A protein has these predicted regions:
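Glycine-rich phosphate/diphosphate-binding loop of Rossmann-like nucleotide-binding domains
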Residues: 6-45, 152-240
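Short gly/ser/thr-rich secondary-structure transition/capping motifs
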Residues: 52-58, 73-75, 151-157, 215-221, ...
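A short, aliphatic-rich alpha-helical micro-motif
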Residues: 64-66, 85, 226-233, 255-258
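Glycine-centered, small-residue-biased loops immediately flanking beta-strands
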Residues: 262
Length: 262
């Protein structure tokens, strides 16, 4: 199969669909791999590394979209990329179609076979391609939240871990899945006062057993959610409905009742 990997063009996207190691593995199995020149620079992978791995470097994305049987990306194709897709082509990338009707219609009209990383499911119901990104998102959320809490960034001036004589910041994590678990792990690791909300008693039991005294758990209903959010310094939304848009659980009323700078 002729497999191509264009450079990502979405703002602030630095990842690449195929690493040199991935290209080498595909070539080893008899596939021909085309990489757009510069596609790997965001991860410090040079064109020469791809050539050494057995890939062909092509200038610009047009040849890849026109000639390759499968296009491997990271983020959903932008409008300019969708116009290049052709019938019978395989598109392999994160898509997140639920909130994006325009992209969905364009993909249907293009006649492509679109495989969304986030819905690829393992034999036990797990989401192996979404999980690592969820782990990153959960951990980064605490890092970003801690920065936002600084006075210089308009925050409450709260240090999540506190110091002797000063209470730690309160972190509320909505959802105890992969994102929520990793967010709670980071927050608890710096010494924050962590509360995890979820509707699944088994999830609450699992995270409660893991964190023991380092985090509290609460059943997620409207009253408990409102109470937790209003006391929080940092709220992290981490609810996943596979293949669907995330529900909007924090209402405008709750936002209005939050502490200034939270």
């Amino acid at each position: 199969m002729l497999i191509g990997c264009p450079k990502e063009i979405k703002n602030h996207e630095y990842r690449v669909g195929l690493t040199p190691e991935s290209a080498r593995e595909l070539a080893r199995h008899g596939h021909e791999v085309w990489i757009e020149s510069g596609a790997g620079l965001g991860i410090d992978a040079t064109d020469e590394e791809y050539r050494t791995a057995g890939a062909k470097i092509v200038e610009g994305p047009d040849k890849i979209f026109a000639g390759c049987e499968m296009v491997v990306k990271v983020k959903e194709p932008q409008a300019g990329e969708r116009s290049k897709l052709r019938e019978g082509q395989i598109l392999y990338t994160y898509l997140h179609l639920a909130p994006d009707r325009e992209q969905t219609v364009d993909l249907v009209n293009a006649g492509v076979t679109a495989i969304a990383y986030e819905t690829v499911t393992g034999p036990h119901g797990q989401l192996p391609l979404l999980k690592p990104m969820s782990q990153v998102a959960g951990r980064m959320s605490v890092q970003a939240g801690a920065t936002a809490l600084e006075k210089a960034h308009g925050g409450r001036g709260v240090l999540l871990g506190g110091v002797p004589g000063v209470m730690p910041g309160k972190v509320v994590v909505i959802g105890g899945g992969v994102v929520g678990f990793n967010a709670a792990q980071m927050a608890a690791g710096v010494g924050a006062d962590v509360t995890i909300l979820d509707r699944d008693p088994e999830v609450l039991e699992r995270v409660g057993t893991h964190f023991e005294t380092r985090a509290k758990t609460r059943f997620s209903n409207a009253a408990n959610l409102h109470d937790a959010v209003c006391q929080a310094d940092l709220v992290i939304g981490a609810v996943l409905i596979p293949g669907a848009a995330a529900p909007k659980l924090v209402t405008r009323e709750m936002l209005g009742d939050m502490q200034k700078g939270a």
